[in-house]
């Protein structure tokens, strides 16, 4: 009995111990339960996310693959079988991309072929001489030859070219006919304004160059001074810009974006070119600005930004470089570039400037480049052609070529204006100023007292001295040279043009390109440094088809130029004084920086003397 109680008591104690143990186990720290709950939540979230991703993938596949059977199979496929489907989709995307690329390439090829066919047909039409589409490098506008011009017989065209002494060298063989009168110009908004009402017919350089420049071609124009070269490039410049929409720029942008740039070697020539060009531009709503050294930069900047930017800039190289370097001007939108007096622009003093300016423009394939000049040395030709694409070369006057390859590819020899009567007087250096005074009094006698006379000196100090000497003699005289401020130079030039002052003393700064009307006489007090400058000096008279006269006072100090001067006189069929021949006819042509080369002017008709030995 007692053992039974003892056994039951031990069982009860074990039961209590188990219950206590269970309670103790259930009462474990709460942290463990929290961790379990967190793990459980994370697992549930992960499962939900995976289900959501699978669902989105399934919907995407349903959209990409239309057959319903494939969609059903995809749902039932396990994860291991989903990989081939993804690969299949990737391959399909690659295939679609490849097909699109092939279509794009075929389309581009087709457009290239059509462009080639159009250009071929255009060239054929040009050759036939019926209609003349543009052979434009930039394709901005076209030139259609007038029906009346196309209808003219070829013999009449040849007679015109011969009479006007026009020689055209065209690498493209486009057979463009010269525009012989203004009615043959293609109709446009500008031409409808009748801008040439004051003129009778185009000058030879305008007549021959316009068909090429209006076609968008690059052009080299070589003609004597006073032949109308300024209008030869002004008309195609304005027509080119007027046919294109003007790009819009941010009004807050303090950088001018011109579409055309004309570069001139001197301030005076730049101002003169701007005056002619702006007259045409204003007729079709284009703006033009002239920038040059010696004037206030801020005023010129304000002109550049006025009216939402400028369309055409006429500039001297120095001031244009300044504005480019400071960011006031960007040439990135230039489609029309002109180098006026190109031989001087590309000569040693300006060649680096021109390279800098043209490098700021679009490539030569994307712009039209024109160069006009009175002289065109061979080395400058090669340099200039690197800026142009197949330029058409128009030469006015019977200019022979020295050297070359026998096909007219040598250097174009310099020639003076044949309408200018040239006279050379060999004088004592100490008596030049008194002889100048005598010539002026003789030239301004009677009814000729108001004739305008241009007097050239070599140095600035000499110009000041001559001006003071003539002023003391009672002659109304003004001067223009590098030591004067720009406003003083402009005032002197305007006084001479208006006739207030009848005598203008100038250095060579005024020799290049200035169009001063009604200059009756040019007097060279001192011979210039080069024969080219001599031709430009005397070219200030006899302009626009009129007659002129030039007198040169030659001294023993100038004898190095006697040979070149004799050749110029003979080519123009002018008398050569015996006193000048005494200085010799040797012509120095620079071939080496240190030594040079000397060539003697030999009469080809003179027979050699046979030498016999006993």
Curated annotation (Swiss-Prot):
Compositional bias of kind Basic residues: 37-58, 91-109
GO MF term list: ATP binding; ATP hydrolysis activity; mRNA binding; RNA helicase activity
One annotated Gene Ontology cellular component of this protein: preribosome, large subunit precursor
A Pfam family it matches: DEAD
Compartments it resides in: Nucleus, Nucleolus
Source species: Neurospora crassa (strain ATCC 24698 / 74-OR23-1A / CBS 708.71 / DSM 1257 / FGSC 987)
Magnesium found in the keyword field: no
Annotated Helicase ATP-binding domain residues: 210-394
Low complexity bias spans: 117-138
Protein name (Swiss-Prot/TrEMBL): ATP-dependent RNA helicase dbp-3
Biological function: ATP-dependent RNA helicase required for 60S ribosomal subunit synthesis. Involved in efficient pre-rRNA processing, predominantly at site A3, which is necessary for the normal formation of 25S and 5.8S rRNAs.
Motif DEAD box in this chain: 340-343
Keyword list, A-Z: ATP-binding, Helicase, Hydrolase, Nucleotide-binding, Nucleus, Ribosome biogenesis, RNA-binding, rRNA processing
Binding site for ATP: 223-230
């Amino acid at each position: 009995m007692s053992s039974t109680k003892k056994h039951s008591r031990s069982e009860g104690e074990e039961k209590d111990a188990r219950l206590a143990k269970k309670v103790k186990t259930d009462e474990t720290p709460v942290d463990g339960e929290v961790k379990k709950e967190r793990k459980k939540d994370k697992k549930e979230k992960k499962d939900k996310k995976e289900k959501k991703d699978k669902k989105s993938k399934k919907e995407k596949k349903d959209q990409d693959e239309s057959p319903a059977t494939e969609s059903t199979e995809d749902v039932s496929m396990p994860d291991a079988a989903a990989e081939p489907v993804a690969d299949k989709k990737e391959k399909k995307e690659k295939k679609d991309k490849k097909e699109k690329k092939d279509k794009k390439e075929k389309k581009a090829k087709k457009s290239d072929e059509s462009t080639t066919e159009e250009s071929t047909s255009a060239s054929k039409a040009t050759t036939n001489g019926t209609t003349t589409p543009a052979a434009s490098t930039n394709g901005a506008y076209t030139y259609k030859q007038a029906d009346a011009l196309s209808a003219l017989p070829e013999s009449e065209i040849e007679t015109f070219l011969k009479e006007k002494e026009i020689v055209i060298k065209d690498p493209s063989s486009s057979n463009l006919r010269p525009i012989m009168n203004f009615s043959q110009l293609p109709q446009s908004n500008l031409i409808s304004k009748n801008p040439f009402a004051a003129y009778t017919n185009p000058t030879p350089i305008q007549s021959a160059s316009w068909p090429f420049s209006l076609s968008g071609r690059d052009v080299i124009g070589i003609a004597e001074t006073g032949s109308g070269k300024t209008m030869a490039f002004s008309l195609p410049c304005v027509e080119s810009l007027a046919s294109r929409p003007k790009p819009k720029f941010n009004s807050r942008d303090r950088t001018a974006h011109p579409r055309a740039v004309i570069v001139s070697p001197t301030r005076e020539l730049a101002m003169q070119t701007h005056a002619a060009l702006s007259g045409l531009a204003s007729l079709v709503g284009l703006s033009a600005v002239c920038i040059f050294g010696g004037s206030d930069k801020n005023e010129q900047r304000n002109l550049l930004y006025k009216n939402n930017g400028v369309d055409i800039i006429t500039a001297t190289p120095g001031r244009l470089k300044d504005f480019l370097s400071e960011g006031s001007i960007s040439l990135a939108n230039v489609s029309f570039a002109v180098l006026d007096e190109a031989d001087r622009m590309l000569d040693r003093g300006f060649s680096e400037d021109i390279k800098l300016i043209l490098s700021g423009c679009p490539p030569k394939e994307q712009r039209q480049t024109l160069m006009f000049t009175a002289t065109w040395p061979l080395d400058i030709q090669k340099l200039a052609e690197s800026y142009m694409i197949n330029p058409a070369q128009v030469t006015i006057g019977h200019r022979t070529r020295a050297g070359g390859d026998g096909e007219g590819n040598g250097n174009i020899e310099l020639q003076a204006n044949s309408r200018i009567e040239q006279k050379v007087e060999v004088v004592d250096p100490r008596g030049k100023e008194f002889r100048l005074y005598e010539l002026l009094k003789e030239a301004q006698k009677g009814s000729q007292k108001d004739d305008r006379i241009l007097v050239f000196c070599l140095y600035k100090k000499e110009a000041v001295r001559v001006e003071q000497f003539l002023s003391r003699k009672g002659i109304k005289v003004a001067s223009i040279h590098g030591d004067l401020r720009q406003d003083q130079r402009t005032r002197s030039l305007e006084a001479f043009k208006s006739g207030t002052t009848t005598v203008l003393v100038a250095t060579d700064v005024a020799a290049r390109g200035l169009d001063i009307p009604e200059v009756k006489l040019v007097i060279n007090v001192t011979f210039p440094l080069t024969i080219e400058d001599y031709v430009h000096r005397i070219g200030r008279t006899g302009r626009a088809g009129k007659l002129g006269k030039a007198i040169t006072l030659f001294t023993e100090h100038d004898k190095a130029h006697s040979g070149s001067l004799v050749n110029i006189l003979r080519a123009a069929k002018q008398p050569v004084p015996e006193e000048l021949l005494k200085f010799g006819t040797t012509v120095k042509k620079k071939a080496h920086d240190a030594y040079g080369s000397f060539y003697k002017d030999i009469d080809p008709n003179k027979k050699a003397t046979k030498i016999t030995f006993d």
